[in-house]
Amino acid sequence: MTEKVTVIGAGLAGSEAAWQLAKRGIKVDLYEMRPKKMTPAHESGNFAELVCTNSMRSNQLSNAVGLLKEEMRQMDSLIMQAADACQVPAGGALAVDRELFSKYVTDKLTSLPEVIIHDEEITDLPSEGITVIATGPLTSDSLAEKIQDFEGAESLHFFDAAAPIIAADSIDMDIVYKKSRYDRGEAAYLNCPMTKEEYDRFANALVHAETAEIHGFENSEVFEGCMPIEVMAARGAKTLLFGPLKPVGLENPKDGKTPYAVVQLRQDNAAASMYNIVGFQTHLKYGEQKRVFQMIPGLENARFVRYGKMHRNTYMASPEVLKASYEAKKRPGLFFAGQMTGVEGYVESAGSGLVAGINAAREALGQETVEFPVTTALGSMAHYITTTDAKHFQPMNASFALIPGLEGKKIRNKRERHEKISERGLADLAAFKAEKLDD
């Protein structure tokens, strides 16, 4: 009889792992402590809740996360099914209605006869049986302690932040204009133009605004890919102009000129009744967010549906603990997945859950676990988190820097080179799937 598998945590990674197990006919006990016990970042008990942005970043094969998405589609990913079904306009990126997305994943998993849902907290590592731990960077204290004991090393951490969401009907449409950068795709973003004087006033107010107190917070522990806007602004007067307020490619159609700075708003739900402020992750006090962000042209009367907030994320010393199959080195049958392993980002977390779920299924079926080719985005992430020097281990997004370069004559055009790497990765994935997985 095939062994049942326990999956702890129904976030992006745990949901994907449960799906990969169930579609292979494996019975799954899926545990999720929410909504009975909430985390500092979550707001519901739904599966795969998106706690930060609603964007899953680029859909292009010239971008590593675009390659990762396509690989996951080829592997019948539940998270990619949901994202494609619930997308909202975002130019060349893939953004979703966060509530519809989470509902899609929840409905799919609760409808599967192979998956039994348990609304309860797990406070210890199961002593036996095949298990996937995917409790995320906000793992409850009791379980986090047990994981740390298992690791035999102190877990690492960084601080992550979310951007505010504002009501669409509170945006001054006479001031903002609709456009995607360089006119890629449809005009999907609302753009708030700033003059130099407006930018200088805003940047000065931002740097001097009062932040919320967070125990143990230090700027050095901020993840670069999700840096609070006020931390970025403090690095230099013009830093924001090369980051989230970059005006290049966003000419204002009202006068044909490129503003000095531009704040972008991205649609947050299918009804287009909410927008998030792109790149404005923050840990300012709520009152300060209202005061400072209402200085942005077009947002003078903005109504905040959700204020930005920050939380501490914990991750494992994976190079010392895991194999590239996401299985623990010292305990066969115990897998870890998601941001807690050191992959960073929604899609990356789901991707790790996909690999862990496939390998947990193989273990349950009496088959050998597999490691995905390092020429794929899925394989390169697993390779990175398990082979990097543990002393310098940091969370990492999908990146072409993790994937071996092309052989032969170097392609000078970066976009073309990246597309060729993606073509090779997808071909290698297809061959790997046919040889190793289609059995």
From Swiss-Prot:
Protein name: Methylenetetrahydrofolate--tRNA-(uracil-5-)-methyltransferase TrmFO
Underlying gene: trmFO
EC number(s) on file: 2.1.1.74
Native organism taxonomy: Bacteria, Bacillati, Bacillota, Bacilli, Lactobacillales
Catalyzed reactions: uridine(54) in tRNA + (6R)-5,10-methylene-5,6,7,8-tetrahydrofolate + NADH + H(+) = 5-methyluridine(54) in tRNA + (6S)-5,6,7,8-tetrahydrofolate + NAD(+); uridine(54) in tRNA + (6R)-5,10-methylene-5,6,7,8-tetrahydrofolate + NADPH + H(+) = 5-methyluridine(54) in tRNA + (6S)-5,6,7,8-tetrahydrofolate + NADP(+)
Binding site for FAD: G9, A10, G11, L12, A13, G14
Enzyme class, spelled out: transferase
Stored HAMAP family: TrmFO (MF_01037)
InterPro entries for the chain: FAD/NAD-bd_sf, MnmG-rel, MnmG-rel_CS, MnmG_N, TrmFO
